[in-house]
From Swiss-Prot:
CC terms in the record's Gene Ontology section: ribonucleoprotein complex; ribosome
Pfam family, one: Ribosomal_S10
GO biological process per UniProt: translation
InterPro entries: Ribosomal_uS10, Ribosomal_uS10_CS, Ribosomal_uS10_dom, Ribosomal_uS10_dom_sf
Protein name: Small ribosomal subunit protein uS10
Assembly mode: Part of the 30S ribosomal subunit.
PANTHER family for this protein: 30S RIBOSOMAL PROTEIN S10 FAMILY MEMBER (PTHR11700)
Gene3D superfamilies: Ribosomal protein S10 domain
Amino acid sequence: MNTTSIKIKLKSFDHRQIDAAAKKIILLARELNIETRGPVPLPTSRAIYTILRSVHINKKSREQFESRTHKRLVILKVLPTNQKLVTEKISRSQLPAGVWIEIEVS
């Protein structure tokens, strides 16, 4: 049968929230009898920001802050007739706060 794949990318600063969101999407897919692959951990991007501790003096005294963006990929194999239903169910599901979701249909 001809199937289309729906790629769902999840991004979050907290790895526990992103894992919970991936679990929720996989459980939703199992309820709808959809073949799933993942969650595939994608590379974590790391941003480091260096600022001066004092405003006008002590150039040697600096402080560093770091933010990590964790990413996961979930792939769903869906029949073309159910594609719209599945994307609506996923976009309307209650995911944890702080999780960004990108849905790509191919």
